[in-house]
Amino acid sequence: MFNMNKVLELTLNHGRCLLTDKQMASDFGSLSTYKTFADLEIALEQTMNYFVEKMIPCCEAVEKGHIAILPTAFLSSVIDDCMEKGIDVTKGGAKYNLSGIQFIQVANLADSLAVIKQLVFDEQKVSAKVLEEALKNNFANQEILRQKLLNHVPKYGNDIAWVDELGVKWARKFRAKLREFTNYRGGAYHMGMYTVSAHVPMGENLGASADGRLSQTPLADGGMSAVYGRDLNGPTAVLKSVSRLDNNLTTNGGLLNMKFLPEFFQTQTGIDK
């Protein structure tokens, strides 16, 4: 899994982790030093590319380790070509030798970028320096600012095209970068969007984010789902937002969680909604 929100955190903070102050990436600047939103995006892409290039050898090491310590005989028996070749799936016996990498987490990423774009650069209603310091201090004594981030900017999952497209844009950039690599079996890397329950530990490794999320709290669940409580325009709007993430972005699978109380369907009004 690739935590794109951590990449954004580092891009906004001189390449340093908000939790440990460790230098984890190149220093392209900080939120208060980028002159335009485009400048921020250039730095974000450079940081993303750096970590993708670091990630691929790690994935290869894990997959090669599986050959030695975790062969999968039963799985291989139901995968095309493994039985015919007499080669375990971990060794490249499958007809299609893809590897999957999950892009985490599109909702928080879109929401954070939307806040920065609208409030900091377009409307200039929030000072870049003030927001930068608030993120470093987990919004201590800045609850009014946090509520502005949460409530004054539209969020992913409400069928608001420009917000959704921020997430789509970066999912496409990530997929394009993955396509530069093949795994050690000669197969392609395919992108997915699902976390199952990993959005919790992924969030634990993040400081506060520009969408108003507090430090070390969970990210949006699922993988394509909106952040809890931010999908305000109903389930159809959620589906329309998710539909902008075309299937080519989730060839390794995508997960949308939508949860309804049973009482929701007990009235005609609820059903109509």
Predicted feature locations:
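Acidic, glycine-enriched catalytic cores built around paired aspartates
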Residues: M1-K273
